[in-house]
Amino acid sequence: MHSLRIRRVPLSKMDKHTIAAYFQGLQDRICAGISATDGGASFKEDQWQRPEGGGGRSRVLAKGAILEKAGVNFSAVEGPLHPKMVTSLNVTEEVEFFATGISIVMHPENPWVPIIHMN
């Protein structure tokens, strides 16, 4: 069993770059743990950019010893709020958004083991 080390960041030092870097590091640690546990395959990475702002890293493991397929994806996107959201939120000035996180999906080889999906 592999343990996941949590790195604590003081709230006073949190900004969007610090938070995104934390999630990228978490993605690295999760992928390393899954690869080590599976033992039969490694992740392939695809980096992408969002024209409106931000981007991410998609990582896929296929045909492993335990997992048929697994994806661990990181994204950090930003930009101006859509006009409908501006109206819905009842804001008068131009507002930007920032969203980041990790999405994980795993499909085991064994059909009796449940699929895993989490964000």
Language-model segments: which ranges?
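Gly/Pro-rich turn-and-neighbor structural signature
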Residues: D15-N90
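Intrinsically disordered, low-complexity segments enriched in polar/charged small residues
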Residues: R7-P10, A32, W112
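N-terminal amphipathic/basic-hydrophobic helices that include classical n-h-c signal peptides
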Residues: M1-K13
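Aromatic- and glycine-enriched beta-alpha-beta binding-site module
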Residues: F74-N119
